[in-house]
């Protein structure tokens, strides 16, 4: 029997269960995902500025949102890719998470409304985050951002997008850090954590198979050499936990600076739940400390 944090248990007892998204019409599934996440944004912390931006791309303007913890000029900037199985989510569903990350790191956070699968499978989302990095380094936010102190971050599917962006972008030398929260990096479904937590702990193995079918991303890890210092975390009760632990080993094996935290008693997506869950707040603090130190 796996231990569940008391606050996590209370959330699970009171929160509406997520439906089988893969069995709903896509528009209905996306609207439902948005409603389920809206609760966690009701207590978004106040910041000095939250500004919407349009990022020009060859395929049209892309919405983005800049979170500034202070109005001090030339602050470091973290480009953030939201989770949602590459199929769901937006800069609105993850507003609270991005605001807290900005506060805890004392850095700007730029959230990106990348194109979603299945309409736009791999590599569309990676192209979009690369375009956001290009734009912010190119001065889109004016003097709010120091283009020489950049980082990438993301949760779940967004962690995979951020990792692939790091190995793809020509701005790799500008990246001081990465923060990857409970990511899905390979289409593997036979790990011990999938066996233990693939049913009954929120995210299911069946849904992950569906997400990967929408995304159609790479089935091998990219070249991981010479990446910036990387912070990773995982909930203990997550079917994706072993993917994170395997990535930690792969990063370390090629000489990267890697930090890992595993949070007991919580499930996939727990950082969205900061309003009611102390381990989520602790995870934001830990990630913020890491990013703040690396972005000095």
Question: Where is each model-derived feature located?
Answer:
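Catalytic active-site module of serine/aspartate enzymes centered on a nucleophile-bearing elbow/loop
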Residues: 277-296
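Proline/glycine-enriched tight loop/beta-turn segments at coil->beta junctions
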Residues: 60-62, 69-77, 225-227
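Hydrolase active-site cap/lid region
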Residues: 167-216
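Gly/Ser-rich "nucleophile elbow"/oxyanion-hole loop immediately N-terminal to the catalytic nucleophile
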Residues: 137-152
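Alpha/beta-hydrolase active-site loop
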Residues: 120-140, 287
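Short beta-strand/loop motif that positions the catalytic acidic residue
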Residues: 232-234
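A glycine/proline-hinged amphipathic helix-loop "lid/cap" segment
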Residues: 1-69, 296
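Short amphipathic alpha-helix adjacent to the substrate-entry channel of hydrolases
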Residues: 92-111
């Amino acid at each position: 029997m796996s231990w569940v944090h008391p606050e996590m248990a209370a959330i699970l007892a009171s929160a509406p269960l997520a439906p089988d998204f893969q069995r709903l019409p896509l528009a209905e599934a996306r609207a439902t995902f948005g409603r389920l996440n809206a609760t966690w944004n009701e207590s978004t912390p106040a910041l000095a500025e939250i500004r919407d931006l349009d990022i020009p791309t060859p395929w049209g303007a892309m919405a983005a949102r800049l979170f500034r913890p202070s109005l001090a000029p030339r602050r470091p900037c973290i480009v953030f890719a939201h989770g949602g199985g590459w199929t769901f989510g937006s800069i609105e569903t993850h507003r609270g998470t991005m605001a807290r990350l900005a506060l805890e790191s004392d850095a700007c956070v730029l959230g990106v409304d990348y194109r979603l699968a299945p309409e736009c499978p791999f590599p569309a989302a990676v192209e979009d985050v690369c375009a956001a990095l290009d734009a912010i380094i190119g001065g889109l936010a004016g003097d709010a951002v120091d283009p020489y102190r950049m980082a990438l971050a993301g949760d779940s599917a967004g962690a995979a997008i951020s990792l692939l962006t790091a190995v793809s972008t020509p701005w790799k030398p500008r990246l001081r850090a990465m923060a990857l929260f409970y990511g899905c990096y390979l289409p593997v479904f036979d790990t011990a954590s999938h066996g233990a937590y693939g049913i009954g702990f929120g995210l299911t193995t069946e849904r992950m198979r569906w997400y990967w079918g929408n995304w159609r991303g790479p089935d091998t890890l990219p070249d991981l050499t010479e990446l910036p210092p990387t912070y990773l975390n995982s909930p203990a009760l997550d079917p994706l936990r072993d993917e994170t632990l395997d990535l930690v080993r792969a990063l370390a094996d090629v000489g990267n600076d890697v930090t890992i935290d595993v949070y007991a008693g919580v499930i996939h997506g727990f950082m969205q739940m900061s309003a009611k869950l102390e381990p989520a707040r602790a995870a934001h603090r830990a990630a913020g400390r890491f990013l703040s130190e690396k972005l000095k």
